[in-house]
Amino acid sequence: FPINRVEKIGYIQKLLEQEKTELPPEEKTETLATDRHNFRITDDAIGIGGAKEKFRNNMAAINLLHELEIENRLATPEEQEVLSRYVGWGGLSMAFDEHNAAWAEEFKELYASLSPEEYRAAMESTLTAFYTPPVVIKAMYDALDRLGFSQGNILEPSCGTGNFFGLLPESMQNSKLHGVEIDSLTGRIAKQLYQKANIAIEGFEKTNLPDDHFDVVIGNVPFGEIRVNDSRYNAQKFLIHDYFFAKALDKVRAGGVVMFITSKGTMDKASPEVRKYIAQRAE
């Protein structure tokens, strides 16, 4: 369910008296804004396929990304089609097993294609990097449309390659897109796919985004028995999925919407503390 941020009138008046906090400046580039293209996802079957097919698509995207970076240029619309088929390494742990004879060639190719840092991050993501099906994202945007949202500042704090951006409805295309992605390889692909978006490649806990700014914070947040080190929230001892809710509520403006996919760990856990925290700050 969407969560609407609410505040007392005195707090709103105080905000209006303060100077507006600006977002970090966009990265400087010689590429003209008119030459930039945001990819549009039109295939609901994106990400569907067997393990070997996903591997081949991933490798094609990685090799193209490295080529683009060597040539210091942005992807063309045709090249964005190739990049869009990157689905990460969730469910592909066999590609990292040097003792798996059925994947011996794939292991060699993968190991040779990635830097040590990229390889380590990819291997660590095999249990966590699962992408959101288009049908789910479309349903979330339908709900957002029914709430009356048409355009504004949208933040996706765990954006992956940017499927939430790629499925943005036509009616919301005038929105300003902001993404955060902790994985370098995935974030770099997202930057090539959504060239007009402002995407930061770092953990959500390290982002310097203004409070009370975004109209919508949307996405599929990470989950697990992991605590994020963020001094602003450490006292609450939030697990990672709950932390994303807490920080998102501070980033969204009063009257804005937080709309997340999360595990049952947020709404069904025995302790009510996280639910109390959310209820005190939103409706």
Predicted features and spans:
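Conserved Class I SAM-dependent methyltransferase catalytic core
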Residues: 180-184, 238-283
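Conserved SAM-binding strand-loop segment of SAM-dependent methyltransferases
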Residues: 196-204
